[in-house]
């Protein structure tokens, strides 16, 4: 029962090891190494530093306990999964913005043809009984056609810049870089007032969901990654991360 509960608790570690393989290490501390090694009929096995299960074969590395690779496990691994999911969301958003910028640019070059089509077809549609003058899409299209070319060029540039911003943010988060986390918090926070302004003009599902995701991302990164000195800052985060390492846990178990 206890073993099953441990597997449930370590499911993300097991999934990660299943995808990327186990990580084993032989410390030069004999007593500590003995707690990580076992013998079977198939040969020696070593405990994985991430999931804690035994893996068949020799250790992948040897050395002092303090030189063991820093493996993401426990809370750190769960944080990495969440942050990478946020990074994927940012990259998808960057792609959508880039496509929007391309669409506006293409529209800017095809305004004449679109206007000619509307001038030719709208009267026909009205005569056929279609209430085209009440269609939101038609109003939006006519408004866009009335915009100056310089305005459309400015919109294209702003969308492209925002796409680049989201792409940088997404890459930094996916790579789990500290600068990416800081960049994400600052870049996202800058646009929160604009999102509040949009919500004040009218509440829509898209606006509410976008605002909620961004606020949650900022709060989560600040608290979980201890950015800008929150909860002790980087030093406290490193201490917490080191405390989750299997070798440290095993050393602590030896002293009890």
From Swiss-Prot:
<keyword id="KW-1133">Transmembrane helix</keyword>
<feature type="transmembrane region" description="Helical">
    <location>
        <begin position="155"/>
        <end position="175"/>
    </location>
</feature>
<dbReference type="InterPro" id="IPR021125">
    <property type="entry name" value="DUF2127"/>
</dbReference>
<dbReference type="InterPro" id="IPR014511">
    <property type="entry name" value="DUF2068_TM_subgr"/>
</dbReference>
<dbReference type="GO" id="GO:0005886">
    <property type="term" value="C:plasma membrane"/>
</dbReference>
<keyword id="KW-0812">Transmembrane</keyword>
<keyword id="KW-1003">Cell membrane</keyword>
<keyword id="KW-0472">Membrane</keyword>
<protein>
    <recommendedName>
        <fullName>Uncharacterized protein Mb0093</fullName>
    </recommendedName>
</protein>
<feature type="transmembrane region" description="Helical">
    <location>
        <begin position="203"/>
        <end position="223"/>
    </location>
</feature>
<dbReference type="Pfam" id="PF09900">
    <property type="entry name" value="DUF2127"/>
</dbReference>
């Amino acid at each position: 029962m206890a073993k099953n509960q441990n597997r449930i608790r370590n499911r993300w570690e097991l999934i990660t090891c299943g995808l990327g393989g186990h990580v084993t290490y032989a410390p030069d501390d004999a007593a500590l190494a003995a707690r990580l090694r076992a013998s079977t009929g198939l040969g020696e096995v070593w405990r994985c530093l991430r999931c804690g299960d035994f893996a068949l074969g020799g250790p992948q590395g040897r050395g002092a306990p303090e030189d063991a690779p820093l493996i993401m496990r426990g809370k750190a691994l769960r944080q990495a999964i969440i942050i990478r999911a946020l990074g994927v969301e940012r990259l998808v958003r960057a792609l959508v913005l880039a496509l929007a910028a391309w669409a506006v640019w293409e529209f800017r070059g095809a305004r004449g043809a679109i206007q000619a089509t509307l001038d030719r077809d709208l009267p026909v549609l009205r005569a056929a009984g279609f209430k085209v003058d009440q269609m939101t899409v038609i109003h939006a299209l006519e408004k866009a056609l009335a915009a100056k070319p310089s305005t459309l060029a400015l919109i294209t540039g702003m969308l492209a810049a925002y796409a680049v911003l989201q792409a940088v943010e997404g890459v930094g988060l996916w790579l789990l870089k500290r600068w990416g986390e800081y960049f994400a918090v600052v870049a996202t926070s800058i646009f929160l007032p604009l999102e509040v302004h949009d919500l004040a003009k009218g509440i829509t599902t898209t606006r509410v969901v976008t605002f909620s995701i961004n606020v949650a991302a900022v709060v989560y990164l600040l608290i979980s990654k201890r950015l800008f000195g929150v909860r002790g800052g980087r030093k406290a985060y490193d201490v917490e991360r080191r405390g989750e390492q299997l070798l440290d846990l095993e050393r602590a178990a030896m002293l009890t």
